[in-house]
C-alpha cells in the first residue's frame, strides 16, 4: 500500500491494518494501474514496435482475492436483524412524524391547513433548491478540477535525507468524483437548511405591492425596500455563498489532484507550482466571487436609508455626500480588482513548474508584485474613502453647520416617520387651560362626567374573584378588560371578564377530571365602570351562575368557555347521542349540572390511529384506553386565543392584550394583529418591546408588551376573533390600504374575511389597540414637531410620565403610566367618544413635572355592519401653552399625598388590619382644564380580602377634593357644585363624610342633597333619615376599626333605612 492515501479509509481496504492480519491466508494480487484510473496495459507501441512505459506513474493497487467457502453467520440471523432494524426505523419515523400529522389535523379542523402546506412547501422547496445548487456548484467545481489533473501528478510527497521525494499512489479520478459528490451534498444540505429559515422574505419578494410613495433619495417606490430588498439581499448572499463554495472546492480538489503543488523548503529547495488549467479555473472563480462582492456592495447603498444614526434613522448629509458615492466607487474597485487578480492568475507563467522558494526569493516577489500591489492600492483607497473622507466631511463641514446641513434629511425623517406610523393625519389643537375650578364648570360636559370610570381593571380582579368566582376551579384574569356596551339605550364603559377554567384550583386532580370532566369555564361577568354599590363593590349588570344580566337576554346565548388564555391543558370532549353526560357544566345544588360538547372544536380522536398519534404527542396512554374517548370524541388543545391566532397567522405581530366580548350571543376573544417592517426608508426605528412596556405589562401575567422587535413601520391591519365555545378563528382585514396585508392575502388566498363580513354587534366591540397607541405615543413625544429646525434643537421634546401609583422602586426604573380607555369629549368632538388616552410631560430629568400635552385616539368603531366609524382611529393631540403650570400626573399624585386632610383620612383608613390601594390616576380634559381622578380602595389583610372602593380623589389645578363619591369630590373642587352628576351620584348621602380640602367650600351642595326642610317631613320619614345617618356613622366607625362584620351589618341597615325613606317620600 502507498503512503498518504487520503481516501483509503472511505473507499479502500487499506485504512485499517487489523483487517488484513492473521486468520486470512488469501493470496494478495498486485494490480498495476496507469495514472491510477485503470489496469496497466502495454498497448502503447512506438513506431519501431517496441513498447514504451505508460504515461504517468505505475502504481500498485493492493487487492485481496475473495476466500472460498461459506460465511460465518447464519442467513436467518441476518434476516431477523434486518427485520428488527426496519421495524425500529418505522417506529422511529412514526414517533417523529406524529407531531407533524397531529398539527395537520389541528390546522385542517380549523380550516387553515394551507398555512402548513404553503410554509412547508416553500421551506422544503428553498432547502432542496439551494442544497441542489450548492451540491451542483461544488461538484462542478471539483469535476472541472479533476478534469484538469496533470498527467504527471501522483498525489503525495515525503522527505528522505532532506530532499523532496515523490512517492505513493495518486488519488484516482473516480474516487475523487465520489468524494466530491458526497461532500457537495453534505455542504448543500447544511447551507440549504439555513436558507429556508427566511421563507417569508422570499414570499414577500415575489408578492410585492406598491406603497404609492417613493423614497426621497433614489426615487424608488417604498415597496421596493419593504418587499423586494430583503429578499434580494438574501438571494445575493446565497449566490455569494455558492460562488465561495465553488472557489473552495476548486482549490481543495486541485491540491488533491496535483494541480497545485506546494511543499515547505528543505535544504534550500521546495516545490511550488500551479498548472495552467488550474490557474484558469481559479482565475474565473476568483473573478466571479469578486463580482458578487461588488454587486452586494452596490445593493448595500439602499441600507443607508434605514441605518440608525445618532439622531435619526436614514441617510444624513454625510451619508448622502460621502458614504453612498464611496460605496459605488468601492464596488467598482472591487470588480476591477477581481479582473486584475483573475487575469494575473491566468497569465502568470512563473507559477508553473518547480521553483526554489528559498533561493529564488526575488523571482517570487516579482511574480506576486501585481496582486500584492493591486490589493494594497484598493485597501489604501478604501480606507481613505470609507473612513477618512466621511470623518473629515462630518467634522469640518457638517458639524460647524449641522442645523442647516442636516435640516433636509431631518425633514425627510419626520415626514417618513409620521407616514409609517400612521401619524400623518394627527389633529393638533392648542388647549388653553385654566387651573381655577369655577362653580358649574362641568354643566356642558355632563355626559363625560357621568362616564368617568371609577373601577380600575388592574385593581378589582380580586374583587371579581371573591364575589363572582363561585368555585375554586374558576378564575378571572389578573387584569380585566375595559369595553363598552349599550345598556338600556345608553353606551356604558364596562369592566368585563370571562370566568375561565383554572385546574390548579381543583383539589381533586387526576387524568379523568383534568381532561374529561372539568373542560370549560362558564359565562362572563361585567360591571359598570362609572359606579359602585353603596359599600364600594362593583355594580354588576352581568353576573352569577347560570349567567344572568343585560348581556345574556338572548335565548341563543352560549356561556360555555372552552377556549381562553388560562386554559392550558387538553380536553377530550364529545360523546355519541344518548350517552350520559360527564362534563361538569356549572355548580348547582349538591352535584352540579353536566353537559356534552356539541360543537366542532378540535381534531377527532374517534379512531385508533388518531388516538395513537395523540397518545404519543401528549405522552398519555389514557387516551388509548379510557372509555371516555369515544367514536364522537374531539381533542381540544392549543386553547389560548393568542396562540391559536399566532399559529394560523405566524407572520403577524400580536397585541399584548386579548379581551372578551359578547357578540351575537356568543363569547368572542378579540385579538389585534399588526403588520410590521424594519425597512421603510427614513422612518425612525423603534424597539416595540420598550415602547409598549408600562406598569401594566410589568405587573400583569395576562397583558404583555410586544417583545424585543425593532420596526419602523406598523399597521393594525388584522382583527382576529376566537370563539370561546368552539375555538374557531376568523381573520378580518381591518386596514385595507396596507400593502403588507395585501401581499399576505395573495400568499394565503381565502384565509381572510373582508370588512363587509363584520357584523354590527362585533363592530361595536372593535377598539383601537393599546400596543399600537403606545408605539405612536412614544414616537409623538418627539414627532409632534413638524419642523426640522425645531426637531434638531430638541427643546420641545416630551416624554410619557412614569406611573405615580407604583412603588418608588418601580418609578426609579422609569416604568411608564399605561394609557386608559375612557369615554370623554376632547377637542374636535361634539359628543363624548370612547377613547384611549395618555399624557406628556417635558423630556429630561427636571423635577418640575408639568403637563405639556394630552393625547387621545377615537376608539369607537361604530355599530354598522361592514363599516368602520368615520372618526375611528383619529388621533388628537391637545398641546398646552408653554407658560402653563398644569400639574403632571406625578405632581398631582404628590399634591394628593401632601394634602393634610387627605393624609389624615388615609391614615385612618389603613389603620389596624386594613390597607389602602390607590387606583389608576385618570386625566380628563374637563371644565376648561385638566381634571385628575383617582379611586381609593380599602382592603383587609386577610387571605380572602378584596378591595372595595371607599373614597375618590379629585384634583383640578392645585385644588384637591376627597370624598366618599366622585360626585362629591368634583363638587369640592368646582365651587361646591360642579354642574354635572357623576355616575355614582346616587350614592351621595345626606351626611357628607368627605373632606373639603380647600377650606372654603362645603362638601354638600344645595339642590343635590336636600329633599326638603325638616319641617316638611313626616315623623316616619325623619326617623328613617336619622336611622340612615346613624347607620352611616356606624359604617365609618366599623371601617376605621377594621371590623368588616359590623361594617356589613351597618351597610345593610343603611340600605333598609334609605329604602324606607324613599317609600315614605313618594
From Swiss-Prot:
Residues 44-61, 1003-1016 have a biased composition (Low complexity). Residues 12-74, 977-1044 are annotated as: Disordered. It is a multi-pass membrane protein. This is UPF0182 protein BL1029. Pfam families: UPF0182. It is found in: Cell membrane. GO terms for cellular component: extracellular region; plasma membrane. Keywords: Cell membrane, Membrane, Transmembrane, Transmembrane helix. The chain crosses the membrane at residues 77-97, 126-146, 179-199, 235-255, 282-302, 326-346, 372-392. Belongs to the UPF0182 family. The keyword Cell membrane applies. InterPro entries: UPF0182 (IPR005372). HAMAP family: UPF0182.
Amino acid at each position: 500500500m502507498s503512503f498518504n492515501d487520503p481516501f483509503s479509509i472511505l473507499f479502500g481496504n487499506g485504512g485499517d491494518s487489523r483487517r488484513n492480519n492473521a486468520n486470512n491466508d488469501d493470496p494478495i494480487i498486485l494490480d498495476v494501474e496507469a495514472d491510477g484510473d485503470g489496469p496497466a496495459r502495454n498497448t502503447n507501441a512506438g513506431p519501431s514496435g517496441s513498447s514504451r512505459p505508460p504515461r504517468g506513474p505505475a502504481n500498485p493497487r493492493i487487492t485481496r482475492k475473495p476466500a472460498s467457502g461459506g460465511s460465518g453467520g447464519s442467513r436467518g440471523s441476518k434476516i431477523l436483524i434486518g427485520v428488527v432494524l426496519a421495524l425500529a426505523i418505522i417506529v422511529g419515523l412514526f414517533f417523529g412524524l406524529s407531531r407533524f400529522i397531529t398539527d395537520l389535523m389541528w390546522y385542517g379542523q380549523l380550516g387553515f391547513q394551507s398555512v402548513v402546506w404553503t410554509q412547508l412547501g416553500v421551506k422544503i422547496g428553498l432547502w432542496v433548491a439551494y442544497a441542489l445548487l450548492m451540491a451542483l456548484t461544488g461538484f462542478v467545481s471539483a469535476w472541472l478540477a479533476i478534469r484538469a489533473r496533470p498527467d504527471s501528478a501522483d498525489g503525495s510527497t515525503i522527505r528522505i535525507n532532506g530532499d523532496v521525494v515523490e512517492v505513493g499512489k495518486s488519488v484516482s479520478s473516480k474516487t475523487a468524483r465520489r468524494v466530491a459528490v458526497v461532500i457537495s451534498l453534505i455542504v448543500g444540505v447544511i447551507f440549504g437548511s439555513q436558507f429556508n429559515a427566511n421563507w417569508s422574505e422570499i414570499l414577500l419578494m415575489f408578492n410585492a405591492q406598491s406603497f404609492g410613495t417613493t423614497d426621497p433619495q433614489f426615487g424608488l417606490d417604498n415597496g421596493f425596500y419593504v418587499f423586494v430588498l430583503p429578499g434580494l439581499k438574501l438571494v445575493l448572499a446565497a449566490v455569494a455563498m455558492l460562488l465561495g463554495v465553488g472557489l473552495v472546492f476548486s482549490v481543495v480538489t486541485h491540491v488533491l489532484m496535483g494541480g497545485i503543488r506546494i511543499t515547505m523548503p528543505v535544504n534550500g529547495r521546495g516545490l511550488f507550482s500551479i498548472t495552467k488549467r488550474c490557474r484558469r479555473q481559479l482565475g474565473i472563480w476568483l473573478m466571479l466571487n469578486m463580482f458578487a462582492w461588488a454587486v452586494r456592495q452596490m445593493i448595500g447603498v439602499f441600507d443607508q436609508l434605514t441605518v440608525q444614526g445618532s439622531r435619526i434613522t436614514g441617510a444624513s448629509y454625510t451619508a448622502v455626500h460621502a458614504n453612498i458615492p464611496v460605496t459605488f466607487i468601492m464596488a467598482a474597485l472591487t470588480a476591477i480588482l477581481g479582473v486584475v487578480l483573475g487575469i494575473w492568475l491566468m497569465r502568470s507563467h512563473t507559477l508553473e513548474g518547480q521553483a526554489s522558494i528559498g533561493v529564488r526569493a526575488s523571482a517570487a516577489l516579482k511574480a506576486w508584485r501585481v496582486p500584492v500591489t493591486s490589493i494594497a492600492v484598493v485597501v489604501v483607497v478604501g480606507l481613505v474613502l470609507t473612513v477618512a473622507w466621511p470623518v473629515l466631511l462630518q467634522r469640518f463641514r457638517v458639524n460647524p453647520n449641522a442645523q442647516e446641513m442636516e435640516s433636509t434629511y431631518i425633514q425627510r425623517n419626520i415626514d417618513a416617520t409620521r407616514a409609517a406610523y400612521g401619524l400623518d393625519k394627527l389633529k393638533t389643537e392648542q388647549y388653553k387651560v385654566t387651573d381655577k375650578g369655577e362653580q358649574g364648570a362641568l354643566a356642558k360636559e355632563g355626559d363625560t362626567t357621568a362616564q368617568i370610570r371609577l373601577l380600575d381593571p388592574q385593581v378589582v380582579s380580586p374583587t371579581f374573584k371573591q364575589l363572582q368566582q363561585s368555585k375554586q376551579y374558576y378564575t378571572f384574569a389578573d387584569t380585566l378588560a375595559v369595553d363598552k356596551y349599550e345598556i338600556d339605550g345608553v353606551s356604558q364603559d364596562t369592566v368585563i371578564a370571562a370566568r375561565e377554567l383554572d385546574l390548579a384550583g381543583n383539589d381533586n386532580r387526576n387524568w379523568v377530571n383534568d381532561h374529561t370532566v372539568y373542560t370549560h369555564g362558564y359565562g362572563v361577568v361585567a360591571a359598570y365602570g362609572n359606579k359602585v354599590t353603596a359599600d364600594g363593590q362593583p355594580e354588576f349588570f352581568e353576573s352569577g351562575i347560570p349567567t344572568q344580566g343585560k348581556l345574556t337576554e338572548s335565548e341563543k346565548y352560549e356561556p360555555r368557555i372552552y377556549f381562553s388564555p388560562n386554559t392550558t391543558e387538553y380536553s377530550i370532549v364529545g360523546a355519541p347521542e344518548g350517552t350520559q353526560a360527564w362534563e361538569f357544566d356549572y355548580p348547582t345544588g349538591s352535584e352540579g349540572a353536566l353537559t356534552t360538547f356539541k360543537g366542532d372544536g378540535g381534531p377527532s380522536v374517534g379512531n385508533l390511529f388518531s388516538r395513537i398519534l395523540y397518545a404519543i404527542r401528549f405522552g398519555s396512554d389514557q387516551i388509548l384506553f379510557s372509555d371516555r374517548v369515544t367514536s364522537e370524541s374531539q381533542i381540544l388543545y392549543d386553547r389560548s386565543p393568542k396562540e391559536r391566532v399566532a399559529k394560523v397567522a405566524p407572520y403577524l405581530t400580536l397585541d399584548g392584550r386579548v379581551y372578551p366580548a359578547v357578540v351575537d350571543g356568543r363569547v368572542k376573544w378579540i385579538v389585534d394583529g399588526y403588520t410590521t417592517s424594519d425597512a421603510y426608508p427614513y422612518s425612525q426605528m423603534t424597539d416595540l418591546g420598550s415602547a409598549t412596556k408600562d406598569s401594566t405589562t410589568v405587573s400583569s401575567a395576562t397583558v404583555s408588551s410586544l417583545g424585543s422587535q425593532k420596526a419602523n413601520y406598523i399597521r393594525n391591519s388584522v382583527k382576529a376573533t376566537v370563539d370561546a365555545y368552539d375555538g374557531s378563528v376568523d381573520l378580518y382585514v381591518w386596514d385595507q390600504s396596507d400593502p403588507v396585508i395585501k401581499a399576505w392575502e395573495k400568499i394565503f388566498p381565502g384565509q381572510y374575511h373582508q370588512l363587509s363580513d363584520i357584523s354590527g354587534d362585533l363592530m361595536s366591540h372593535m377598539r383601537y389597540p393599546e400596543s399600537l397607541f403606545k408605539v405612536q405615543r412614544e414616537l409623538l413625544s418627539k414627532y409632534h414637531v413638524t419642523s426640522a429646525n425645531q426637531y434638531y434643537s430638541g427643546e420641545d421634546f416630551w416624554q410619557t410620565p412614569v406611573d405615580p401609583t407604583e412603588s418608588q422602586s418601580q418609578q426609579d426604573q422609569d416604568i411608564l403610566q399605561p394609557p386608559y380607555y375612557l369615554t370623554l369629549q376632547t377637542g374636535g368632538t361634539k359628543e363624548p367618544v370612547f377613547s384611549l388616552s395618555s399624557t406628556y410631560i417635558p423630556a429630561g430629568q427636571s423635577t418640575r413635572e408639568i403637563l405639556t400635552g394630552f393625547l387621545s385616539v377615537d376608539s369607537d368603531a361604530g355599530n354598522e355592519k361592514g363599516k368602520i366609524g368615520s372618526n375611528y382611529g383619529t388621533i388628537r393631540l391637545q398641546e398646552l401653552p408653554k407658560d402653563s403650570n398644569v400639574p403632571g400626573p406625578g405632581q398631582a399624585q404628590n399634591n394628593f399625598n401632601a394634602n393634610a386632610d387627605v393624609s389624615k383620612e388615609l391614615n385612618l383608613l389603613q389603620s389596624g388590619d386594613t390597607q389602602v390601594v390607590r387606583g389608576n390616576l385618570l386625566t380628563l380634559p374637563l371644565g376648561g382644564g385638566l381634571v385628575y381622578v383617582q379611586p381609593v380602595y380599602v382592603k383587609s389583610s386577610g387571605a380572602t380580602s378584596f378591595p372595595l372602593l371607599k373614597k375618590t380623589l379629585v384634583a383640578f389645578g392645585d385644588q384637591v377634593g376627597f370624598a366618599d363619591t366622585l360626585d362629591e369630590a368634583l363638587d369640592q373642587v368646582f365651587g361646591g357644585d360642579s354642574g354635572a352628576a357623576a355616575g355614582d351620584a346616587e350614592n351621595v348621602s345626606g351626611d357628607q363624610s368627605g373632606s373639603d380640602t380647600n377650606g372654603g367650600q362645603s362638601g354638600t351642595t344645595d339642590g343635590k342633597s336636600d329633599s326638603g326642610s325638616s319641617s316638611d317631613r313626616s315623623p316616619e320619614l325623619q326617623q328613617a333619615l336619622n336611622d340612615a345617618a346613624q347607620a352611616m356613622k356606624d359604617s365609618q366607625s366599623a371601617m376605621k376599626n377594621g371590623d368588616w362584620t359590623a361594617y356589613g351589618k351597618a351597610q345593610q341597615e343603611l340600605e333598609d333605612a334609605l329604602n324606607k325613606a324613599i317609600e315614605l317620600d313618594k
